[in-house]
A protein has these predicted regions:
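Hydrophobic alpha-helical transmembrane segments of multi-pass membrane proteins
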Residues: 18-23, 60-71, 124-132, 194-205
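Juxtamembrane transmembrane-helix boundary signature
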Residues: 16-52, 73, 169
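Signal-peptide-cleavage-adjacent N-terminal segments of secreted and extracellular proteins
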Residues: 1-21, 49, 146, 165
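Generic alpha-helical transmembrane segments of integral inner-membrane proteins
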Residues: 18, 22-26, 127-131, 156-160, ...
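Early transmembrane alpha-helices of polytopic membrane proteins
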Residues: 52-85, 137, 153-164, 227-246
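Inter-helical loop and helix-membrane interface segments of multi-pass membrane transporters/permeases
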Residues: 4-5, 38-60, 75-135, 141, ...
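Membrane-embedded translocation segments of transport machinery
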Residues: 1, 145-275
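Membrane-interface alpha-helices at helix entry/exit sites of multi-pass transporters
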Residues: 12-17, 56, 222-231
Length: 275
């Protein structure tokens, strides 16, 4: 799902993302796949085979992957909390989704100086989420490969369902028009280019060690160049498609609130839960 929507210039950003994809994303994706495929090792020992002092590069990749795993598992815990709440009637977030997310689920404090208590149900959901991860990885690639059949296909089912639902909402057309609006002036701004490259690195999981690990399980005869181009392109196309239902939802919310899309006061991960 696209992470940035502020300013409603995604079509312009698509051009920047494509440039970033083919100049840095695909080459680095292919390089990491080949590194694991050639040495048959994970990131730590794979980089060490290049030079004995490069072990620190592999260690840094594993460390970053651990941090990312903690972050995503927290988001999964929030999703489990919402799943449990979805059985209530009426839905607890129907009236004020923003307050429900920040006050009801996160129980967030006004500032770091005023720490709130532990949200025990979120903690429990986090434990359950980690148990799911442990179960998926319990037998290595034998179990994770089977789980991937579900985790790799279900997002596309959800995207189609959300696209249909978003298209039927009032204000969806305005949201899609904002999504496809072009602002060529943004092409001259360094900040938008930096964000585009950041998005490509983040969405492809480059430099996190995962691609090296995946490559280590691939037969040496498999075409790594084909996969190094095809997978990133599909990833980018999926993100662009997902943007349609995101902006359809934003168009609906902006119409309900009577404000412009760019004036909505939420972004980032909260967007998925508030919309």
């Amino acid at each position: 799902m696209p992470r940035r929507w502020r300013g409603a210039r995604r079509l312009t950003r698509l051009f920047q993302d494509v440039i970033a994809l083919f100049t840095f994303g695909c080459p680095l994706f292919t390089l990491e796949l080949k590194l694991g495929q050639y040495f048959r090792k994970g990131p730590f020992h794979g980089f060490q085979h290049i030079h004995k002092r490069f072990w620190c590069v592999g260690f840094a990749s594993v460390l970053m992957a651990a941090f990312m795993g903690i972050f995503y598992n927290t988001v999964m815990a929030w999703s489990l909390v919402y799943l449990c709440y979805s059985f209530a009637d009426p839905l607890p977030w129907a009236e004020d989704p923003i307050s429900f997310f920040y006050d009801g689920v996160l129980q967030s404090s006004p500032s770091i100086a005023e720490m709130s208590g532990i949200a025990w149900y979120v903690l429990l959901a986090n434990v359950v989420s980690w148990l799911f991860v442990g179960f998926a990885l319990s037998k290595g690639v034998l179990s994770s490969g089977k789980v991937a059949y579900v985790t790799a296909t279900m997002p596309y089912v959800c995207i189609v369902a959300l696209l249909v639902r978003g298209a039927l909402l009032p204000g969806a057309g305005a949201g899609v028009r904002a999504y496809l609006r072009v602002d060529f002036a943004k092409l001259a701004e360094f900040d938008t280019w930096a964000r585009a490259f950041n998005q490509i690195f983040f969405s492809l999981s480059v430099a996190l060690g995962a691609l090296v690990t995946f490559g280590s399980y691939r037969p040496k005869s498999e075409d790594y160049v084909r996969d190094g181009v095809l997978v990133p392109v599909i990833n980018c196309a999926t993100s662009f498609t997902a943007g349609f239902f995101v902006f359809a939802m934003l168009g609906y919310i902006s119409e309900q609130k009577g404000v412009e899309i760019r004036e909505l006061e939420f972004s980032g991960f909260a967007l998925a839960f508030i919309t």
